[in-house]
Amino acid sequence: MQYLKPINVFSEIGRLKKVLLHRPGKELENLTPSIMKRLLFDDIPYLHVAIQEHDSFADTLRGNGVEVVYIEDLISETLSNDDSIKEQFISQFILEAGIRTENKTRALKDYFCNMSVNDMISNMIAGVTRDDLKNYKSDSLNSLVNSEYPLIIDPMPNILFTRDPFASIGHGLTINRMSTKTRHRETIFAEYIFKYHPIYKDNVPIWYNRDEDTTLEGGDELVLSRDVLAIGVSERTESESVEKVARKLFEQKISFNTILAFQIPQSRAYMHLDTVFTQIDHTTFTSFISDDMKFTIYALTYDVSSGSIKVKSEKAKLEDILGFYLGCKVNIIKCAGGDLIHGAREQWNDGANTLAIAPGEVIVYSRNHMTNKLLEEFGIKVYQIPSSELSRGRGGPRCMSMPLIREDI
């Protein structure tokens, strides 16, 4: 089936037809113990094995009829046919990497321009070391004081998690303002792809843009149905951003009539809403919550006559909230069945962060064996991928994928 729009995502579970990934690269080898916390990693993955695991992920997707595209290929295609756009991109990338001095900027421009577009993108993501710019010399105070720091531009290891920088909603998407400085550059790629790539330019409405002054991340955005969108108010996404997205969707008269803002704990274990729950079938969700935990949610609706957004606050159990707004009885499968020890461990390794490739079919990390067994007992078809290295980045299959096209349900 051919879709008239290049973006078509009206659910979390419609059969996945096209998805965006990033294959791990040298950026993981430029992580060091002294900078990994600042770059939001708890450990350093072994690149050779991480690539094998990620290729297994991509092969599983392809084996189920999903077209896999890579962000590095899309941005390379975007920049290959117009030198002026390429030059503009290089200048913006260098500026947003925090480079301010004229001689360092010139050296970096020369470095990036003297390689193919594909190599340039790979090296931008990998980061630029002092050894990469062997001909660059500076006797400025700043350079001398920081001479022992090996990187001129930090690597971008979090681009592995393509879900966060931008998120498909309906026929459009949000290009997000990331919460942490280290992830700001990731959204430059989205800006240029959706502005200049021949498939996407002039064809994709933008519901939220990276130049907004409040933060929003894709892991907090869940398309529950054609009518209902859930957004987490978390340590990474601010409440003002939810209102901005809601207003844009309501005013553009997209199908969504209710935006549910879920207030979740601001901690690394609950980094995004999709670490708390994900949808795996029409009425079934995975989650990491206690039986008595109640969520505070804010239901945003639109008053057409006044042009105002109405907000109603509620506090209830997750299954009651989802059941009411989806109009059905909801089943919640807890990580490791809610076991205090195994549940916490499997949540840490993204046991609740599943990727639905069709209703009742999910890709999961094999290491979360107790949760995976429960899924199978509920009749869910489970595709397990290896994850000893990928899991070190604290993101699961949903985090590592950005759906571009899903079948409508």
UniProtKB/Swiss-Prot annotation:
One of its GO terms (biological process) is arginine deiminase pathway. The active site is at C399 (amidino-cysteine intermediate). The gene is arcA. It is an enzyme of class 3 (hydrolase). GO terms for molecular function: arginine deiminase activity. Its EC number is 3.5.3.6. The keyword Cytoplasm applies. Belongs to the arginine deiminase family. This is Arginine deiminase. PANTHER family: ARGININE DEIMINASE. It comes from the Bacteria. GO terms for cellular component: cytoplasm.
